[in-house]
Amino acid sequence: MKSLWLCWALWVLPLAGPGAAMTEEQVLSSLLQQLQLSQAPTLDSADVEEMAIPTHVRSQYVALLQGSHADRSRGKRFSQNFREVAGRFLMSETSTHLLVFGMEQRLPPNSELVQAVLRLFQEPVPRTALRRFERLSPHSARARVTIEWLRVREDGSNRTALIDSRLVSIHESGWKAFDVTEAVNFWQQLSRPRQPLLLQVSVQREHLGPGTWSAHKLVRFAAQGTPDGKGQGEPQLELHTLDLKDYGAQGNCDPEVPVTEGTRCCRQEMYLDLQGMKWAENWILEPPGFLTYECVGSCLQLPESLTIGWPFLGPRQCVASEMTSLPMIVSVKEGGRTRPQVVSLPNMRVQTCSCASDGALIPRGIDL
């Protein structure tokens, strides 16, 4: 079975782009932008020979240098596996429900979340209620269903984030699917021990105006199964994941092995020598150079049978999924005097390489 699986899979050639190494031009461009300059200044060696770097400036530089190894910016995301998690309605009002999903140990270790789908069973509207509604409100038969991620903060306050929203008809019934991938991404960012995943489901009027006030009151979602008592209508959370053992990157490249088309996605070390750049002379005081990295190699592609469900996703590519900043000490000339200044250039060094699909959602960070 394993050999058959590998026969289905494809390998793509390395692509230049998000995982490419930082170039001299990019460093210069970022530095000019940070200092709001149009071109690199020309400084004489006499301007910097006798200039001492104060202790507080060097301390600031060292602190940023240490922090750059801890602070990372993320960017990246299929499904070899999916799991269903049964949820329960914790609280129910006229048009709002709060779903609670126990998530611990639901996501396999060393896996990548591709998509999370919330499935709610819309119950059919009784015929008598439907006929009465059509007689009183003939202009609109739809309601808006909104899914929000709810976070309970340590101080007891609540914060919500909009996840998905769509219109449903009161004439329909059955399973409705909502994309809640971003909510699970938010949940994964919580510190341990994590609280359960809380999803707030709101049913509202389609729009303001006469004839629309009661449509949303007829939309009901099953909380404890279908009328047959088999529990098939309760809320379900499908988690689609990939095993990164097969579909992820391998970490750092082996320096003893040359990179080829068949090399699995990895981070390759490179050194950018700032001292050898004419424009940096007498301008950049620290560092003399720095280790930079690029993401090289190929990523295992999913067989067509698994990609049909996600037509919006392109091929999996080897890209930089985490970047760090690059602190520098530069010479700044003001009023005939030259002084040292610390700057930090964001997203200048590749920290982690990953296999990600073109077109996949870039997870937002929690800002609630």
Swiss-Prot record:
Does Cytoplasm appear among the keywords?
no
Q: Which SUPFAM superfamilies does the record cross-reference, listed alphabetically?
A: Cystine-knot cytokines (SSF57501)
For this record, the Gene Ontology CC terms, alphabetical, are: extracellular region; extracellular space
- InterPro entries with a match to the protein in the record: Cystine-knot_cytokine (IPR029034), LRDF (IPR003942), TGF-b_C (IPR001839), TGF-b_propeptide (IPR001111), TGF-beta-rel (IPR015615), TGFb_CS (IPR017948)
Annotated Gene Ontology MF terms?
Answer: cytokine activity; growth factor activity; transforming growth factor beta receptor binding
Q: What is its main location?
A: secreted
CDD domains documented for this protein: TGF_beta_LEFTY1_2
Q: What is this protein called?
A: Left-right determination factor 2
Task: Spell out the post-translational modification annotation for this entry.
Answer: The processing of the protein may also occur at the second R-X-X-R site located at AA 132-135. Processing appears to be regulated in a cell-type specific manner.
Note the pro-peptide positions.
Answer: 22-77
Q: What organism, scientifically named, is this protein from?
A: Mus musculus (Mouse)
Glycosylated residues: list them.
158
SMART domains, per database record:
TGFB
The record's subcellular locations are:
Secreted
- Kindly indicate where the leader peptide sits in this chain: 1-21
Q: Member of which family?
A: Belongs to the TGF-beta family.
**Known role:** Required for left-right asymmetry determination of organ systems in mammals.
Per the UniProt entry, the disulfide pairs are: 253-266, 265-318, 295-353, 299-355
- What Pfam families does UniProt report for this protein, alphabetically? TGF_beta, TGFb_propeptide
* Keywords of the record: Cleavage on pair of basic residues, Cytokine, Developmental protein, Disulfide bond, Glycoprotein, Growth factor, Secreted, Signal
